[in-house]
From Swiss-Prot:
Cystine crosslinks: 60-73, 66-79, 72-84
Lineage: Eukaryota, Metazoa, Ecdysozoa, Arthropoda, Chelicerata
Organism: Atrax sp. (strain Illawarra) (Funnel-web spider)
Protein name: Omega-hexatoxin-Asp2a
Notes concerning its domains: The presence of a 'disulfide through disulfide knot' structurally defines this protein as a knottin.
Localization of this protein: Secreted
């Protein structure tokens, strides 16, 4: 494979640009520490006292008995044997639906 001189030059320039940007980010981090870090800002936010959506949804699905005409937890799942079962498409959904 032959590379033209222009493509090699562009690759070197882009690589140097990436190193410069990473160096600037690292320099900013070294000066300000975690104060400039977005993750640190997210950690400092107050914790919501309510359960996260996935936990609430899981509790609802696992603890709720349904009837065929009921809307289980707002998921519009399938009601199988009195339990809310989320709709899963494809081969996996067919296998899981057949098992339940």
């Amino acid at each position: 494979m032959k590379f033209s001189k222009l493509s090699i030059t562009l690759a070197v320039i882009l690589t140097q640009a990436v190193f410069v940007l990473c160096g600037m980010k690292n320099e900013d981090f070294m000066e300000k520490g975690l104060e400039s870090n977005e993750l640190h800002d997210a950690i400092k936010k107050p914790v919501n006292s309510g359960k996260p959506d996935t936990e609430r949804l899981l509790d609802c699905v696992l603890s709720r008995v349904c009837s065929p005409d009921a809307n289980c937890c707002g998921l519009t799942p399938i009601c199988k044997m009195g339990l809310c079962v989320p709709k899963v498409g494809g081969l996996l959904g067919g296998l899981l639906g057949g098992i339940l």
